[in-house]
Amino acid sequence: MLYWLLYQKLFPYFRPFRIFRYLTFRTAFASLTALLIALLIGPYVIEKLREFQIGQYIREEGPQAHQKKAGTPTMGGVLICIAILLPTLLWSDLSDPFVWIVMLSTLAFGAIGFADDYIKVVHRRNLGLTARAKMTYQILASAAIGVALVVLQGQGSYSTDLMVPFAKSLRPRFSIPALLHVPHLAYFAFIPFVIFVIIVIVGSSNAVNLTDGLDGLAIGCTIIAAGALTVLTYVSGHAVFADYLELQRMPMVGEVTIFCGAMVGASIGFLWYNAHPAQIFMGDVGSLALGGAIATVAVVIKQELLLPFIGGIFVLEALSVILQVGSYKLRKKRIFKMAPLHHHFELIGWSESKVIVRFWIAALVFALFALTTLKLR
């Protein structure tokens, strides 16, 4: 909105407004705007959640130290979504389709999480939507994103080819060649790509959801992942940097940098209230929205295979649950004292603060490694 008003409309009459053409300037201001929104309306949101008695239910089989957190306001992800989406609307070029894709992805997964949280609050138990219902909605939302990207591919704005880290010349195609030139069936050739998008986005949203078990853990890792994505999105949309780093040149994805910057600012603002001891929890509305947003950005900028490093802690947390469940079903034995992984470290004697900070450090190392792959091609 501000980009349209101040640059596209008023720039001819007031030349200093040319500064709004620069992506770095608008990204910085989107991040600051998101931070201020989160900080300023955070106390109001916390007060209203308490007023409506929207508190966290703590499962009895979890670590006993967590029982004191029962009743802490939850569904704080609403605050995160507002703080991300408003600055994106203000500072980005809204004619860019990729901006709408990442915003609508955030809204869709946030809505799924909101429904899940609402059911938990109403029934006062730690079970919301059924696993089947939640998975169905996530698959439908992810499939819609995949289809939208296939349409953009047909318009020449996107490529469904996969970019492989460390192998600049390797670009596997996610399509069925036999269908590409068949009238009325060409779009069906991209079904493998849509399936891949579903796996990436659904996996990421649930991985962030599993990580959200300690004060500030998931949001701190999100700040790091979103920061890495901000860099990757900027260079992917910058013609000179993309050519130099031998990335696929995608000029239109540059505007998504503003969304990533807003995600960083909103997450920092939320961490102010979510830091141990937390005054508010993000709930599923926050974790699913952030996980969906992170994965959608990665898909849009063709860095899906870097996502396990960009969000390394999220992957480890999800793997710990998969391994724990698989081991128990096959061998009737558990690998970890408790899954997800952060609870295992709590039960072996690490304090909550130590687990959080050490996981943040690991997340930073993963993200830095992801950024180094830009040059290792």
From Swiss-Prot:
PANTHER family: PHOSPHO-N-ACETYLMURAMOYL-PENTAPEPTIDE-TRANSFERASE, PHOSPHO-N-ACETYLMURAMOYL-PENTAPEPTIDE-TRANSFERASE HOMOLOG
Protein name: Phospho-N-acetylmuramoyl-pentapeptide-transferase
HAMAP family (alphabetical): MraY (MF_00038)
GO molecular function ontology, one term from the record: phospho-N-acetylmuramoyl-pentapeptide-transferase activity
Membrane-crossing segments per the record: 27-47, 71-91, 94-114, 139-159, 182-202, 216-236, 252-272, 280-300, 305-325, 354-374
Domain of life: Bacteria
InterPro entries the UniProt entry points to: Glycosyl_transferase_4, PNAcMuramoyl-5peptid_Trfase, PNAcMuramoyl-5peptid_Trfase_CS
Source organism of this protein record: Acidobacterium capsulatum (strain ATCC 51196 / DSM 11244 / BCRC 80197 / JCM 7670 / NBRC 15755 / NCIMB 13165 / 161)
Main location: membrane
Function noted in UniProt: Catalyzes the initial step of the lipid cycle reactions in the biosynthesis of the cell wall peptidoglycan: transfers peptidoglycan precursor phospho-MurNAc-pentapeptide from UDP-MurNAc-pentapeptide onto the lipid carrier undecaprenyl phosphate, yielding undecaprenyl-pyrophosphoryl-MurNAc-pentapeptide, known as lipid I.
Record pathway: Cell wall biogenesis; peptidoglycan biosynthesis
Record's bilayer topology term: Multi-pass membrane protein
Gene Ontology CC terms: plasma membrane
